[in-house]
Design a protein with these regions (language model features):
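An acidic/histidine-cluster motif and surrounding catalytic segment
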Residues: 1-86, 96-133
Length: 133
């Protein structure tokens, strides 16, 4: 069954600051996520999302989402899977704009932007629960 409609996906994407953007969004299994994470980040385990910036102006990038991980996280956090997908798409997009969460200060900036965008979409703050980073 469809996880989200084209209409919902376009609504999420329209909340982004940059309108001149080209994204490829792929949904993969755990094996492919692990292979990509290992190849590009030297982390030999699957992850919920990977972001790959191809070009900065305009933003061109790939977002790779791992459905089994996202489904498990949504279940574990007792949130709607569609809301978790929206959060991760926004999270990945923010990485493409140059934000990261490696340092606490940067993490707070990124989280605040995520929360603000999600609020516009009427999605609750994911950091009030035990979100997996």
């Amino acid at each position: 069954r469809n996880l989200f409609s084209k209409k919902i996906c376009l609504l999420w994407l329209s909340s982004f600051k940059h309108h001149n953007i080209s994204l490829t969004i792929r949904i993969v299994d755990e094996l492919e996520s692990q292979l990509l994470n290992n190849k590009f980040r030297n982390i030999n385990k699957p992850t919920n999302i990977l972001s790959f910036l191809i070009d900065e102006n305009p933003i061109v990038g790939d977002l790779i989402l791992c459905h089994p991980i996202i489904k498990k996280e949504a279940r574990d956090q007792n949130i709607k899977i569609k809301d978790h997908y929206a959060h991760l798409l926004i999270h990945g997009y923010l990485h493409l704009t140059g934000l990261d969460h490696e340092k606490e200060k940067n993490a707070q900036i990124m989280e605040n932007k995520e929360i603000a965008i999600l609020k516009k979409l009427r999605i609750k703050n994911p950091y009030k629960s035990n979100i997996i980073k």
